């Protein structure tokens, strides 16, 4: 069985302050995108995991094995399984690669063993696997509140396009939040639905990302786009309405900017509640 394990973007992320448990209260807009890893699952005589493009992730601490352990505890099924992952999502990129793998693995196990777990059950289990893991059991568009793990599904479609810019070095989420200062946080009465409050602390830690954003702002200056950081980084992204591509002049400028910058062009992706994210998305599997 084969499954797309999609990346996600934070279209905005607001930090509302520090909680009593020392975590930060946030509100964020999650969006699944048509780019990600490919997971293959089969029943086997022994447990195994192969990760193409990232063999250093073939460890017992991989998020996939955490899903397997949780599934086994919950269902009592202990049949060995074999995983093959074609890794495209960079580690520490702010794209939730590990969380997406965990969610996709949980869904895949439910499918292959026909255990009939509902989305609600899997979403509840996913809360034990990571803050943004439950999001992937939405339709692909949702608000995340509390620490980001409480999901409010959004039904409206987004007609956007995104250009992704990866970094050779990731950013640890814990390090990014540890660098947050009170002045970085948003007012509950004045939320901006395009900004990421983690940008300032991350840019203090990573001057190269700040400079890269300025370079992108200059490159895309003639186009009506938004440029931001997703999650705690290190991925930057350009966002623009898809309708721009219907204008030949804009389309040519977009193509030129994407080519000159070496970005990866992708789109939103939605999930049917009765299935998983489509593995047949051309842009999602272009690199596999």
From Swiss-Prot:
Domain of life per record: Bacteria
InterPro entries found in the cross-reference section: GHMP_kinase_C_sf, GHMP_kinase_N_dom, IspE, Ribosomal_Su5_D2-typ_SF, Ribsml_uS5_D2-typ_fold_subgr
BP GO terms, sorted: isopentenyl diphosphate biosynthetic process, methylerythritol 4-phosphate pathway; terpenoid biosynthetic process
Listed pathway(s): Isoprenoid biosynthesis; isopentenyl diphosphate biosynthesis via DXP pathway; isopentenyl diphosphate from 1-deoxy-D-xylulose 5-phosphate: step 3/6
Catalytic activity field: 4-CDP-2-C-methyl-D-erythritol + ATP = 4-CDP-2-C-methyl-D-erythritol 2-phosphate + ADP + H(+)
Signal peptide annotation: none
Record: residues binding ATP: 90-100
Record: active site: 8, 132
GO-annotated molecular function: 4-(cytidine 5'-diphospho)-2-C-methyl-D-erythritol kinase activity; ATP binding
Keyword terms: ATP-binding, Isoprene biosynthesis, Kinase, Nucleotide-binding, Transferase
EC number(s) on file: 2.7.1.148
Cited NCBIfam families: ispE (TIGR00154)
Family: Belongs to the GHMP kinase family. IspE subfamily.
Function: Catalyzes the phosphorylation of the position 2 hydroxy group of 4-diphosphocytidyl-2C-methyl-D-erythritol.
Protein name: 4-diphosphocytidyl-2-C-methyl-D-erythritol kinase
Species of origin: Chlamydia trachomatis serovar D (strain ATCC VR-885 / DSM 19411 / UW-3/Cx)
Lineage of the organism: Bacteria, Pseudomonadati, Chlamydiota, Chlamydiia, Chlamydiales
Gene transcribed to yield this protein: ispE
């Amino acid at each position: 069985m084969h499954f797309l394990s999609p990346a996600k973007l934070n279209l905005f992320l607001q930090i509302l302050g520090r909680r009593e448990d020392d975590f930060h209260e946030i509100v964020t807009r999650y969006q699944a995108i048509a780019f990600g890893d490919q997971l293959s699952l089969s029943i086997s005589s022994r447990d195994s995991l192969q990760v193409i493009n990232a063999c250093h992730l073939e460890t017992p601490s991989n998020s996939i094995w955490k899903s397997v352990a949780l599934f086994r505890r919950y269902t009592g099924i202990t049949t060995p399984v074999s995983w093959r992952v074609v890794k495209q999502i960079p580690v520490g990129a702010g794209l939730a690669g590990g969380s997406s793998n965990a969610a996709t693995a949980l869904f895949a196990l439910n499918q292959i063993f026909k255990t009939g777990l509902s989305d609600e059950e899997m979403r509840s289990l996913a809360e034990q696997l990571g803050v943004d893991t439950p999001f992937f059991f939405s339709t692909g568009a949702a608000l995340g509140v509390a620490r980001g793990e409480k999901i409010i599904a959004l039904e409206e479609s987004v007609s956007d396009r995104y250009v992704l810019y990866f970094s050779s070095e990731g950013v640890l989420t814990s390090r990014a939040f540890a660098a947050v200062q009170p002045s970085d946080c948003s007012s509950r009465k004045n939320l901006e639905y395009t900004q990421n409050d983690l940008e300032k602390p991350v840019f203090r830690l990573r001057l190269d990302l700040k400079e890269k954003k300025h370079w992108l702002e200059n490159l895309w200056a003639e186009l009506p786009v938004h440029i931001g950081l997703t999650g705690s980084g290190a991925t930057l992204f350009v966002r623009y309405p898809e309708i721009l591509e219907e204008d030949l002049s804009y389309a040519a400028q977009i193509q030129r900017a994407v080519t000159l910058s070496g970005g990866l062009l992708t789109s939103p992706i939605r999930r049917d509640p009765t299935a998983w994210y489509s593995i047949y998305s051309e842009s999602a599997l272009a690199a596999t």
